[in-house]
Amino acid sequence: QRDLCGVLDEMRLVKDAHELALMRHAAQISARAHVRAMQHCAQALRAGQEVREYHLEAELLHEFRRYGAQAPAYNSIVAAGANACVLHYRADRAPVGSNDLVLIDAGCEYDGYASDITRTFPAGGRFSGAQRALYELVLTSQEAAVAATKAGARFNAPHDATVAVLAQGLLDLGLLDKNQHGSAQDVIERRAYFRFYMHRTGHWLGMDVHDCG
């Protein structure tokens, strides 16, 4: 008998045109769901209504099914305020304050293929100065990762690009002491950024949200 796992893993690693089309459609549905949740949050808070994390999760689920997705690709994460600092937060019960940042990590599954989107937004529709500074740093790091993602690039290239931007940004914002860390390279070598960014950047995606790779 031959173990087919290795063969199947190799088949799943490279997607054909049909698979890519399904993945793009799943991503489009998920993007609509994120926008719906953001809009509902700001509108409800401005109207003086209570908003809880599970209310935003319900908006996500509504949009997934509305556009034909069979299910969430994984348990959705909706984390308001300090809850967003908890990796893989699952409670989804806390109230959302108008001055909170809200992190949503959610994606749908469409015809067997997963999507995965994480976004952070100001619950009431406007950033404070400190929130905007952090958001723009993360956005710049994301743009660096996207620019580093290309055919023939090393798998680690997007992560390395992200960390380089974050390391310099943490120094510039004063979140890391320049007297202790003389340069962004020093921050990277000593992994001083790890307190704020302990994840990797990106993962394989396909029939599973963390697909074979």
Q: Where is each model-derived feature located?
A:
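Active-site neighborhoods and metal-handling regions in enzymes and metal-associated proteins
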Residues: 1-213
